[in-house]
């Protein structure tokens, strides 16, 4: 059984908020049997999250052992809890400290899965991954004598794409309601303020230009009006705590922006709700 505890066991610089099922053959097979009931669209949704804020790791330990893990790291505990409940994994939080640039780091929550459970999850999300496809293939190849099946790349139906896009946007995108106040003059020459009706806006920002362009193309084929892709040149900024020898200037990556407003944003929101 999963043991849930807020007593928070310490694990190095991390704390375990909720203990999941240990990765053994018996436990993994139990979880996999439950996961087999999940729909393909749910797997596409999960793939979107993994492409956005997830990780597929095949790093080895300092002793040369495989440390294969699939997981996700966020500041939103609720989402991490959902993944942990789904995959019967632990919820871990890093102890609060300060980032290298000197600013306070927000508490991050992590859940990850390994063993046969991770292999099964990787098999299911691989057909829907876009950004981390190679990571998934490398992950599966790390299992001895494991046959890699060929799957079509980026050949998703509209329903599969929208499920993936929903997960990806929950990781990388934002919806917001904009309220605009304008200065007007009436027929008597009197000045007054006019509050325009609230407007729904959506934006997706990422450093990967190709994935932004792919999303734009797919959405336009589905009838959404997309403005041209926005671009912001990566600027230079300080990195490292003030007053230390590690203080230096680094250049941030260029950013690409997908934007929808008004009715297009509302329709997109309704399309993503299911």
Functional labels for PLM-detected ranges:
Residues 1-274:
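Internal intein/HINT superfamily modules and their associated LAGLIDADG
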